[in-house]
Amino acid sequence: MNNKTFIDNLKELTEPIVNDLDYELYYLEFVNENKENYLRIYIDSESGIGLEDCEKVSRAVSAMLDEKDPIDTSYYLEVSSPGLERQLYDDKHIEDNIGKTACVRLESLFNGGRKFEGKLKSFDNENLTLEINAEDFKIPRKKIKRINLIYEG
């Protein structure tokens, strides 16, 4: 099973549990760091996420994982909020944050830079538009490595 299929399977098993507890499954990843495997589940809600929320989801997901046993290796389960300076992984995340300030990091140089900060203005299949110093700045999406919100307190 390739990694995308593996992740999709985990999402399919996890999302209904998270939703039943009145949270949104923001993102899920399975990573290897320092020779240890981690299943990281990021949850969100309109009212924010606290430690109790993470514990509740962790208990429910852990019970399902014990029952279904979809992961054939040892791992640690981590449940957390995506945070105030959250990474935007997909179109829904970008759409939900139009008008907010973000940092866009690129794979390679573009217009003399690899990092741009500005207000998320719009996006389509080809470009992401930031408003930087009251000017629209289009960045080709294929060059984008990562987008994070910038907390403005």
Swiss-Prot record:
Keywords carried by this UniProt record: Cytoplasm, Ribosome biogenesis
One of the GO BP terms on file: translation
Superkingdom of the source species: Bacteria
Listed Pfam families: DUF150_C, RimP_N
Entry-linked InterPro entries: Ribosome_maturation_RimP, RimP_C, RimP_C_sf, RimP_N, RimP_N_sf
SUPFAM superfamilies from the UniProt entry: YhbC-like, C-terminal domain, YhbC-like, N-terminal domain
Keyword Transcription regulation: no
Protein name per Swiss-Prot or TrEMBL: Ribosome maturation factor RimP
Organism expressing this protein natively: Clostridium tetani (strain Massachusetts / E88)
Gene this chain is encoded by: rimP
